[in-house]
């Protein structure tokens, strides 16, 4: 047993308190994720204006729509997919975003679904771009290249918050014994950090490669969608399935099943992008 294995015993998920309000590291990590994604997108606009012909003010307005869509979609998606008491929230809709418990204590908003956030993001992007759909793919590509590094902070936040823990490390796994984290007297994979690397860093490199080798609008979001789906599918083998969900056919987790649906959505965007690029060439 090394110091890393027992890091949770030495770490408090609460960063600091403001009176009765406890600020968790996860909240700070999420803020870093938003800032990172925002400024990464601005950098891309400045560095490659031909691929991303968008004014800063225009992007700032769009970013607010996208972030709102992500938050709404992520929270509602969690309620519909993962929350065992979803019926209560559907009849008490205002409680979905209530950051206080029954005693009036601030506890924050817990329970977000990445795939729900993705749906919310796509809906918000479409609504914002509906008057000029030619820019829709440009916006999606811009987020595809700026989101992965922000995502890294989000998963680090999950790790610091000691949530979304990994599966139990087999006793014959030498690497697992080294990198595992003790959670409730069980050595588990640090699945949050595995996801940060696979779904954040690796996917970012995939999208950057696609940016260098493609010119068609919409292909970056397709590469992101397919790349994330693959990396999430792999990472789920190290992540403990939600206790209220378990596994389904072929022992697949809900995250893996939703990732398969994400592949279908990505292929749909690919078809749309292909048709859209043909129209642009014809008009030119």
From Swiss-Prot:
Changing residue 182 to I: In strain: HP439. It comes from the Bacteria. One of its GO terms (biological process) is lipoprotein biosynthetic process. Keywords: Cell inner membrane, Cell membrane, Membrane, Transferase, Transmembrane, Transmembrane helix. The chain crosses the membrane at residues 14-34, 62-82, 106-126, 136-156, 190-210, 218-238, 252-272. One of its GO terms (cellular component) is plasma membrane. It is found in: Cell inner membrane. GO terms for molecular function: phosphatidylglycerol-prolipoprotein diacylglyceryl transferase activity. A 1,2-diacyl-sn-glycero-3-phospho-(1'-sn-glycerol) binds at residue 155. Its EC number is 2.5.1.145. It is a multi-pass membrane protein. Pathway: Protein modification; lipoprotein biosynthesis (diacylglyceryl transfer). Changing residue 87 to S: In strain: HP439. The keyword Transmembrane applies. InterPro entries: Lgt. NCBIfam families: lgt (TIGR00544). PANTHER family: PHOSPHATIDYLGLYCEROL--PROLIPOPROTEIN DIACYLGLYCERYL TRANSFERASE, PROLIPOPROTEIN DIACYLGLYCERYL TRANSFERASE. Belongs to the Lgt family. Catalyzes the transfer of the diacylglyceryl group from phosphatidylglycerol to the sulfhydryl group of the N-terminal cysteine of a prolipoprotein, the first step in the formation of mature lipoproteins. This is Phosphatidylglycerol--prolipoprotein diacylglyceryl transferase. The lineage of its organism: Bacteria, Pseudomonadati, Campylobacterota, Epsilonproteobacteria, Campylobacterales. The gene is lgt.
């Amino acid at each position: 047993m090394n110091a890393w294995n027992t890091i949770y015993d030495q770490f408090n998920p609460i960063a600091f308190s403001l009176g009765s309000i406890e600020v968790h590291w996860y909240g700070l990590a999420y803020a870093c994720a938003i800032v990172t994604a925002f400024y990464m997108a601005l950098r891309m606009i400045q560095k490659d204006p031909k691929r991303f012909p968008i004014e800063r003010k225009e992007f700032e307005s769009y970013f607010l729509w996208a972030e709102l869509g992500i938050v709404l979609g992520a929270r509602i998606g969690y309620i519909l997919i993962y929350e065992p008491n979803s019926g209560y929230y559907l009849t008490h809709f205002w409680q979905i975003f209530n950051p206080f418990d029954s005693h009036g204590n601030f506890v924050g908003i817990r329970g977000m679904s990445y795939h729900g956030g993705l749906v919310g993001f796509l809906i918000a992007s479409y609504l914002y771009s509906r008057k000029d759909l030619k820019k829709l793919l440009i916006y999606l590509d811009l987020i595809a290249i700026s989101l992965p590094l922000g995502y890294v902070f989000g998963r680090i936040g999950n790790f610091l918050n000691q949530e979304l823990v990994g599966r139990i490390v087999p006793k014959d796994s030498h690497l697992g014994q080294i990198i595992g984290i003790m959670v409730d007297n069980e050595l588990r994979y640090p699945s949050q950090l595995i996801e940060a690397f696979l779904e954040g860093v690796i996917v970012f490199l995939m999208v950057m490669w696609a940016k260098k080798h493609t010119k068609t609008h919409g292909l970056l979001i397709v590469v992101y969608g397919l790349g994330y789906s693959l990396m999430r599918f792999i990472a789920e083998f190290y992540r403990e399935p939600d206790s209220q969900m378990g596994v389904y056919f072929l022992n697949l987790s809900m995250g893996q099943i939703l990732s398969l649906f994400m592949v279908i959505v990505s292929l749909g965007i690919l078809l749309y992008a292909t048709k859209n690029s043909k129209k642009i060439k014809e008009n030119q």
